[in-house]
A protein has these predicted regions:
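Conserved polymerase palm-domain catalytic core
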Residues: 1-157, 162-165, 169
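A conserved non-catalytic segment of reverse transcriptases
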Residues: 39, 43, 48, 151-221, ...
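Short, solvent-exposed helix-loop connector elements
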Residues: 51-56, 213-227, 239-251
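Non-catalytic, peripheral interaction segments enriched in hydrophobic/basic residues
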Residues: 228-282
Length: 316
């Protein structure tokens, strides 16, 4: 797990412009605009104004894109250490391995002294996967040194760590991932990824859904029940759409379902304001039918007829 200390505050402007040019982006007007964005004045709390000499604007519309340009060089360097290592590729070609048959190529590469590694990155958040702890420790040192020398970026030693995925979870983009045994194949232990919503994301989702469920029961101010239900349904779709790729999403959504059903049972079902009877609610759209049509958890508001999407019913 890598964490770059204050990444967006420490991007080197000169290096970034050279990277943009090296990528083939040579429109001088565009580069001028990017320079102006990078050097946009910042008003300080005391009222003074400073011109930044490094970093990209926090929340700036092109900051994520600039982050990818900066770290694109890291991606290629990591790839060159294993997947696209020129020495290994030459060795594979000499052995007559065709380019399409990468599995055989990797088998040969594993017999060399190369360090097997695979990177997954989103903006400045990235993970590097290795087979052994010793390899991971060496990779950690190498990447830390490379980032410092090539991009002038510093790794946070407190937040950067080596994790054994057989024993502990690693969090990435709101997910927590681990590997678990899946029997043996050709005499070797095989593993598959086990993934869930990370604890913080699950807790936040639970709090927001429960709060919105209470607002359906008792709308705030002049907001109507149908607006509150629509807001709740949007939240359900957002959570399910993002996290549905996790293997354990059904377990996580059942946890959320129990929390919101406590609110609905105490505040809505008890007051006879919800019904399971689909004839008393509005007709479901084609998309709603495909997604929730088979769910016994679906409820309808008796007053406005809107369906309340069941957070506990999620399909991969």
């Amino acid at each position: 797990e890598f964490d770059i200390k204050g990444f967006f505050d420490n991007v080197n402007h000169s290096k970034l412009i050279r990277q943009i040019w090296a990528m083939g982006i040579r429109d001088t007007r565009l580069i001028y605009i990017i320079r102006q964005i990078l050097k946009a004045p910042i008003r300080m709390p005391d009222g003074s104004t400073i011109i930044p000499i490094k970093g990209t604007p926090q929340g700036g519309i092109i900051s994520p894109l600039l982050a990818n340009i900066v770290l694109n060089e890291l991606d290629h360097w990591i790839e060159s250490q294993w997947q696209e290592n020129p020495i290994a590729l030459k060795h594979i070609r000499d052995r007559g391995i065709k380019g399409m048959d990468k599995s055989n190529g990797y088998t040969i590469m594993k017999k060399t002294n190369l360090k097997e590694m695979f990177e997954v990155r989103y903006a400045d958040d990235f993970r590097v996967f290795c087979r052994t702890k010793s390899t991971a420790e060496k990779v950690k040192i190498a990447i830390t040194q490379w980032l410092s020398e090539r991009l002038r970026l510093e790794i946070s030693q407190e937040k950067t760590r080596v994790v054994n995925l057989k024993r502990h979870y690693s969090e990435f983009l709101g997910f927590k991932i681990k590997v678990k045994p899946k029997g043996k194949e050709y005499g070797r232990n095989r593993y598959v990824v086990s993934s869930y919503m990370c604890d913080k994301a699950l807790k936040n989702a639970k709090q927001k859904l429960v709060k919105q469920a209470k607002q359906i029961a008792k709308p705030v101010g002049n907001r109507r029940e149908d607006i509150e239900i629509s807001t709740y349904n949007s939240m359900v779709l957002g959570i399910q759409n993002y996290y549905r790729i996790a293997m354990g999403i059904n377990h996580d959504c059942r946890v959320l379902h129990r929390a919101v059903m406590t609110v609905f049972t105490n505040r809505l079902l008890g007051g006879n304001r919800l019904t399971k009877d689909r004839n008393k609610g509005r007709k479901l759209t084609k998309t709603e039918l495909e997604r929730f049509g088979k769910s016994s958890m679906l409820r309808f508001s008796k007053s406005c007829g809107l369906p309340i999407y069941p957070i506990g019913y999620v399909q991969h």
